């Protein structure tokens, strides 16, 4: 029996299933309750809802972005921006580093959240979210985007966020969008680990046991691929990962790769959609089999000793309720 709990939070619904209830989260250890519960509810929940209306479920609105919180300024976070250029692939990454202003008051190592699709993520980080984080053991924020004024660099993310062909191990045409390349996740991960992360750690001390990676859609594939890679990150948030992409290539990898049992690794799988006023799903491409795929992943991770949980997040017009399947 799967129990799904829907909790109303300003018309957003956060769901934990597979026997994990919201009350359980509220009673987790001090580490989870004070840091990652806040991150989940304030950033990951809102970005999942945002993501559900974007690239995987509906065509993203590719309009130039207004000034973000780093440009406007925040009372709670200081932001730095740095560009990283890869000459071999002619790409320039724009990375925003958000450091809580409490850093000036303490020498503690900080939890950190590395977010993909950084341009879009930064456009939806608001002062009220940063205030809430600041008041609850604020994490360092690292938004990894591209040199563009649009929310997404679709061709670049298609290459960077997806795993290589399982037979050749090389990039190839994206089977979903043949005009783009795919399969460059290993190279992109090296940029993060060898260039971006060291720059972050030169600016602020990070806690190695509290380094989170968040990605949506293709970014969710990158998160899962990074879990299989096993380096650097301790917490993995895969929001609406495109598990059906390329004949379920990521599912095939997960089924075959043997993970080393690491109790310090934690995985959250997240799915979501938006409902219209009439109660119908906004997404025309909603994967009805997505929950079953996530269940299979959870089962595999559980067998290999990786702590994993599943969240279902939906925006709708209804009262709090519990659904059982």
Where is each model-derived feature located?
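A domain-start/cap signature at the N-terminus of enzymes
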Residues: 56-111
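Serine-hydrolase catalytic machinery in alpha/beta-hydrolase-like enzymes
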Residues: 108-191, 195, 199
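Active-site nucleophile loop of the alpha/beta-hydrolase fold
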Residues: 146, 237-245, 274
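Alpha/beta-hydrolase fold nucleophile elbow
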Residues: 205-216
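Gly/Ala-rich beta-loop-alpha elbow adjacent to hydrolase catalytic centers
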Residues: 215-219, 223
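Conserved hydrolase catalytic core segment
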Residues: 225-234
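The feature captures the conserved acid-bearing segment of alpha/beta-hydrolase catalytic domains
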Residues: 244-314
């Amino acid at each position: 029996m799967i129990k799904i709990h829907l909790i109303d939070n300003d018309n957003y619904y956060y769901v934990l299933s597979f026997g994990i209830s919201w009350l359980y989260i509220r009673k987790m250890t001090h580490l989870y309750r004070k840091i990652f519960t806040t991150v989940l509810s304030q950033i990951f929940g809102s970005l999942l809802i945002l993501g559900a209306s974007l690239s995987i479920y509906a065509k993203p609105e590719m309009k130039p972005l207004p000034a973000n919180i780093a440009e406007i300024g925040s009372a709670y976070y200081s932001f730095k921006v740095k560009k990283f250029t890869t000459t071999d692939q002619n790409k320039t990454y724009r990375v925003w580093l958000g450091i809580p202003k409490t850093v000036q008051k303490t020498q503690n190592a900080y939890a950190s959240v590395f977010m993909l699709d950084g341009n879009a993520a930064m456009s939806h980080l608001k002062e009220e979210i940063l205030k809430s984080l600041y008041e609850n053991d604020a994490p360092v924020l690292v938004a990894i985007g591209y040199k563009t004024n649009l929310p997404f660099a679709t061709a670049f993310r298609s290459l960077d966020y997806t795993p290589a062909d399982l037979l050749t191990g090389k990039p190839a045409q994206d089977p979903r969008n043949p005009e783009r390349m795919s399969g460059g996740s290993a190279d992109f991960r090296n940029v993060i680990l060898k260039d971006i992360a060291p720059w972050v750690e030169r600016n602020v001390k990070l806690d190695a046991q509290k380094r989170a990676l968040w990605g949506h859609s293709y970014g969710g594939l990158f998160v899962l691929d990074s879990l299989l890679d096993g380096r650097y990150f301790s917490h993995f948030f895969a929001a609406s990962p495109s598990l059906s992409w390329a004949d379920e290539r990521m599912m095939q990898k997960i089924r075959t790769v043997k993970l080393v049992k690491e109790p310090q690794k934690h995985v959250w799988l997240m799915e979501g959609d938006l409902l219209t006023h009439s109660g119908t799903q906004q997404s025309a491409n909603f994967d009805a089999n997505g929950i079953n795929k996530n269940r299979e992943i959870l089962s595999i991770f559980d067998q290999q000793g990786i702590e994993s949980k599943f969240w279902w997040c939906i925006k709708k017009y209804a009262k709090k309720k519990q659904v059982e399947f």
